[in-house]
Amino acid sequence: MGKRLFGTDGLRGQVNIYPMTADVALRLGLAAGTHFRNGNRRHRVVIGKDTRLSGYVFESALTAGLCAAGMDVYLVGPLPTPAIAFLTRNMRADLGVVISASHNPFMDNGIKFFDKDGFKLPDEMENKITDMVLDPDWQWDYPAPERVGRAAKIEDSPGRYIVYLKNSFPAHLTLDGMRVVLDCANGANYKVAPLALEELGAEVIKIGTEPNGLNINHQCGSLYPGVAAGKVLETRADVGLALDGDADRLIVVDEKGTVLDGDQIMALCADDMLRRGALRNNTLVATVMSNMALEVYMKERGCKLLRTPVGDRYVVEAMRREGANLGGEQSGHLIFMDHGTTGDGLMAALQILRIMRERDRPLSELAGQLQLFPQELINVHVERKIPFEQCQPVLDGVAKVEAELGDRGRVLLRYSGTEAVCRVMVEGEDPEQVKRLASLLAETVQKHLR
């Protein structure tokens, strides 16, 4: 039909405004169930969510649609997105569903799917599901009454996920004596993350672990790393860890209160894996948003940085294609393919804590190897996402900025896959020049793409 429901990270929008409505979710459950039902055996679906109040609405609607399509539904409650990917594999399910809008505020929600192997669905599969949802005349292939699905709650899911996480941490190591500030954004990891770290021996100072359905990501979590940074300095902690609402991304704070983004974390992990001979094909996969300094850093070590479009699903696709086992995004999505299939904030945190413990050095020293180029990112609200090549003034503006930067900088324009926003990014060596050029280009975009 040509229309799309899904962005770079599933379906997302404001609750009770199309397409984030109960009736769309019901049809989405029917469509997904129809698509994944194969043969006469019982089919299984795992559904998890974050802590948003509206999660109950979409959990019920999806469950109704999936059961009507003949799928047995297992409800695991509030759990991180990567936990659903793991449980889908672990429980031999045919499909995993996450109800979350990630780092967005509580009034938004979203729906994304994982296949039986724990990977996000490719575009072509999402498009097939979309066609069924959007076609009002679609003839549903309902199963016989005795073949409709059942729904059941699974109570031990958090424990399964914790065991899985701890299995990625060396058995001979503990976190005894380590003080960790942990900000869970009042989101999906509010129970699991503190418990996992405490079981490994850490002293955990908690932030954002009291969700009420409305406070997810509210002035806490990975979008507000200053909160964790302040607590690190106040408590003299060894490290600060800030997760987002569905806990698939991580921002880290060192013992001096310095915030480290995904690029700096990837550099640290790549260096560690190189030292251990574990970086497969000497390749790190990142997106077009990653800092130029990361590319230089990898080249200096005889390694390759492979860039993809923005979205951890595209990073994962490239990792699978290239045989890489480390990838991520500047925003804090980090994928360790030896352990998981998608971005996992707590898994990434455990890898960093392991490096700190094994090297017995403060994080500021370990992560200080990567000196980032100045980078300015401006989000410009747009009403319509017109292809850039159809707007000559914007193309002229980009060319002008690129000419001034020369080969010591770069420009990137891209539309958000989840918001009505055009992201304007300028990078170079001179911070004042970078800031000035980004502002000029953002003004051009705002004027001609509104």
UniProtKB/Swiss-Prot annotation:
Catalytic activity: alpha-D-glucosamine 1-phosphate = D-glucosamine 6-phosphate
SUPFAM superfamilies per the UniProt record, alphabetical: Phosphoglucomutase, C-terminal domain, Phosphoglucomutase, first 3 domains
Cofactor-binding details, from the entry: Binds 1 Mg(2+) ion per subunit.
Cellular component annotations (GO), alphabetically ordered: cytosol
Pfam families per record: PGM_PMM_I (PF02878), PGM_PMM_II (PF02879), PGM_PMM_III (PF02880), PGM_PMM_IV (PF00408)
Binding positions (Mg(2+)): S102, D244, D246, D248
GO biological process, one term: carbohydrate metabolic process
Residue positions of the active site: S102
Record CDD domains: GlmM
Keywords, in A-Z order: Isomerase, Magnesium, Metal-binding, Phosphoprotein
Phosphoserine found at: S102
GO molecular function: magnesium ion binding; phosphoglucosamine mutase activity; phosphomannomutase activity
Disulfide bridges in this chain: none
PTM annotation: Activated by phosphorylation.
Enzyme Commission number(s) of this protein: 5.4.2.10
Cofactor annotation: Mg(2+)
Family per record: Belongs to the phosphohexose mutase family.
Family annotation (PANTHER family): PHOSPHOGLUCOMUTASE (ALPHA-D-GLUCOSE-1,6-BISPHOSPHATE-DEPENDENT), PHOSPHOHEXOSE MUTASE
Task of the protein: Catalyzes the conversion of glucosamine-6-phosphate to glucosamine-1-phosphate.
Protein known as: Phosphoglucosamine mutase
Species whose genome carries this gene: Nitratidesulfovibrio vulgaris (strain DSM 19637 / Miyazaki F)
Gene label: glmM
